[in-house]
Structures are given as structure tokens and as C-alpha cells.
């Protein structure tokens, strides 16, 4: 039997399953485990090559007849905010996002459950238990943290933190060339605040403050209404067969 060192990545292919984005299509994924001493370096390389992280798994689409999933990353330094995006920032001026260790909490899970039930009731994550949520948040061998958004309080100017229950949460990886928004969720009763867009705008600001050139948004799927929002942050780069291509 051939043995493989723990630090040598092995890649696997999933069986076909229904595509969650395009009706009538099937999806397959290639994946590997992010474990061992080289997990962080491997995650950096794979993210730049179009992979996404979920817990200790890095994956990317490997569909036989479709190439609709396209990795996108915002060019932070050149990002041109639109009028509607500026209004979203103003609408959420009383929110404070605080970086916190990637530790799960009951108030996070309560918000996560409400978000799934309201926004993704027919999705693959809808049956996630509190244990599943805890694993999603803390099961990581790479540099990751939570950004937890709460309302501004009377003493927020002193301690720099919001108060009350979370309004929105983002699990964020820190890479050598950018931030990667792994998963985000928010209060579904606050839909008028466009909190998903707000978190992206806030992460663009965070990446710029850290001197990082990119914000990785995951996959954009042309023709999928679920993914349309990712095309609104420009300039951005999209990973094509010839490499990353800038889109203005």
C-alpha cells in the first residue's frame, strides 16, 4: 500500500448531485483536506486557484458539462463605490463590526437559524444543528476569525464595540493577499438594510486598512439570481482559464 505524508495534499472527486444554482444541472466538486503544518500555505495557494474553504476542506467545482461557477475577487485599492452602495453604508452607520475569535455562541446560532429558515429554507444547510454550526465556525487550521456586527451603544465610542445581540456575522479568513468571506448571515427582519452588501463593503474597508489587495467573494454564477450581487463590486477579477481577468 502506498502511504502519503500528512502534509501532502490528496484530491478527491464527489459524485454528481443536483446543482443548487442552475436548474437541471448537476454539480461535482474536487476537494482536499486542509490539515497539518502546511494547511495555511495550502489554503493560500488553493484560494488563489479558485478553491473555497469549508471547515478543513478546500473545494472547487469540477462539473463535467458546465463552467458557470467563476471565482471572483474585488480589487480593493481601485474599488469604486456606487451611489446605492454609499447609501447602504449610511443606512448602517450605527453598526459596529468587531473581530472576534472563531468561537461559536448561542446568540450566533439563534441568528444563523433565523437566517436559514427565512432565506434558505430549501437549501442544503437548513438542517444544521448547533453542533454543525460550531464545527463550521471553529473547525479550522488556517488564520480565521469572526466579524460580529452589533448596534452602536452609548459607550461604543470608548470601547469600540457594539451592544446587544448580533445583527450580522461573517466568518472571515485572512490570507497573504486578501480577506476571504467564507460565510455570512444576518437578521432577516432587517432586509431593508441590505446587510449582506454592507458586510462586503465593510470587508473592502478592512482589507484596505490592512494593505491587502483583494477581497475574495467566492463564486459568481452568471444567470443565478442568488449570485447576481457579487457582480456589483467593481473593479473585480474573475478566474478564467487564462488566469485572473480584470472586469471594470
Swiss-Prot record:
Pfam families: ATE_C (PF04377), ATE_N (PF04376). InterPro entries: Acyl_CoA_acyltransferase, Asp_Glu_LeuTrfase, N-end_Aminoacyl_Trfase, N-end_Aminoacyl_Trfase_C, N-end_Aminoacyl_Trfase_N. GO terms for molecular function: arginyl-tRNA--protein transferase activity; leucyl-tRNA--protein transferase activity. Keywords: Acyltransferase, Cytoplasm, Transferase. The keyword Acyltransferase applies. GO terms for cellular component: cytoplasm. It comes from the Bacteria. Its main location: cytoplasm. One of its GO terms (biological process) is ubiquitin-dependent protein catabolic process via the N-end rule pathway. Its EC number is 2.3.2.29. The keyword Acyltransferase applies. It is found in: Cytoplasm. Transmembrane segments: none annotated. It catalyses: N-terminal L-glutamyl-[protein] + L-leucyl-tRNA(Leu) = N-terminal L-leucyl-L-glutamyl-[protein] + tRNA(Leu) + H(+); N-terminal L-aspartyl-[protein] + L-leucyl-tRNA(Leu) = N-terminal L-leucyl-L-aspartyl-[protein] + tRNA(Leu) + H(+). Belongs to the R-transferase family. Bpt subfamily. PANTHER family: ARGININE-TRNA-PROTEIN TRANSFERASE 1, ARGINYL-TRNA--PROTEIN TRANSFERASE 1. Functions in the N-end rule pathway of protein degradation where it conjugates Leu from its aminoacyl-tRNA to the N-termini of proteins containing an N-terminal aspartate or glutamate. This is Aspartate/glutamate leucyltransferase. The lineage of its organism: Bacteria, Pseudomonadati, Pseudomonadota, Alphaproteobacteria, Hyphomicrobiales.
Amino acid at each position: 500500500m502506498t502511504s502519503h505524508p500528512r502534509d501532502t495534499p490528496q484530491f478527491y472527486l464527489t459524485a454528481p448531485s443536483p446543482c443548487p444554482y442552475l436548474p437541471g444541472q448537476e454539480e461535482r466538486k474536487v476537494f482536499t483536506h486542509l490539515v497539518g503544518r502546511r494547511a495555511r500555505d495550502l489554503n493560500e495557494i488553493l484560494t488563489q486557484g479558485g478553491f473555497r474553504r469549508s471547515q478543513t476542506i478546500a473545494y472547487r467545482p469540477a462539473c463535467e458539462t458546465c463552467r458557470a461557477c467563476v471565482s471572483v475577487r474585488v480589487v480593493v485599492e481601485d474599488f469604486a463605490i456606487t451611489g446605492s452602495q454609499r447609501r447602504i453604508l449610511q443606512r448602517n452607520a450605527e453598526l459596529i463590526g468587531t473581530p472576534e475569535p472563531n468561537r461559536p455562541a448561542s446568540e450566533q446560532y439563534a441568528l444563523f437559524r433565523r437566517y436559514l429558515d427565512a432565506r434558505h429554507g430549501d437549501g442544503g444547510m437548513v438542517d444544521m444543528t448547533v453542533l454543525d454550526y460550531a464545527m463550521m465556525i471553529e473547525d479550522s487550521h488556517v488564520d480565521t476569525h469572526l466579524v460580529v456586527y452589533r448596534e452602536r451603544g452609548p459607550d461604543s465610542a470608548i470601547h469600540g464595540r457594539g451592544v446587544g445581540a448580533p445583527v450580522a456575522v461573517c466568518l472571515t479568513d485572512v490570507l497573504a493577499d486578501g480577506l476571504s468571506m467564507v460565510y455570512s448571515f444576518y437578521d432577516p427582519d432587517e432586509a431593508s438594510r441590505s446587510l449582506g452588501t454592507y458586510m462586503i463593503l465593510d470587508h473592502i474597508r478592512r482589507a484596505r486598512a490592512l494593505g491587502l489587495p483583494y477581497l475574495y467573494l467566492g463564486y459568481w454564477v452568471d444567470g443565478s439570481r442568488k449570485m447576481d450581487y457579487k457582480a456589483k463590486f467593481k473593479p473585480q477579477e474573475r478566474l478564467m482559464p487564462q488566469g485572473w481577468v480584470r472586469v471594470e
